[in-house]
Amino acid sequence: MGGKKKPTLSQLAKKAEKEKAQQAQKAKKEVKKEETPAKRTIQVLDEKVFQAIAKEVQNMRVITPYEIASKYGIKMSVAFKVLRNLKERGDLVLVAKGHRTEIYVPAKRS
């Protein structure tokens, strides 16, 4: 009844070339991955960073959690908590609150 036929010599050669090219690309990707270090984010905030954020926030026009998270390398959830804490302390005033974000201004500017 037949079955699968044997590949021709040219087909075998093409297959071998493709495999070599794929292996070369894999090796290239692995080298690339090793060169770029992963960006670390802070999950738990220490008092020193909190004080730095509190000081910096007073000089900004508007403050969003994304700005704080990207500037200090912290998670968005931590940035939300920091800004809410600063609001409770009276350093910030909530201007607008949407579904996903909150916009604050320093208390002295409001």
From Swiss-Prot:
Residues 14-38 have a biased composition (Basic and acidic residues). The gene is rps25e. Transmembrane segments: none annotated. Belongs to the eukaryotic ribosomal protein eS25 family. InterPro entries: Ribosomal_eS25, WH-like_DNA-bd_sf. This is Small ribosomal subunit protein eS25. Residues 1-38 are annotated as: Disordered. Keywords: Ribonucleoprotein, Ribosomal protein. GO terms for cellular component: cytosolic small ribosomal subunit. The keyword Ribonucleoprotein applies. The keyword Isomerase does not apply. It comes from the Archaea. One of its GO terms (molecular function) is structural constituent of ribosome. It comes from Pyrobaculum aerophilum (strain ATCC 51768 / DSM 7523 / JCM 9630 / CIP 104966 / NBRC 100827 / IM2).
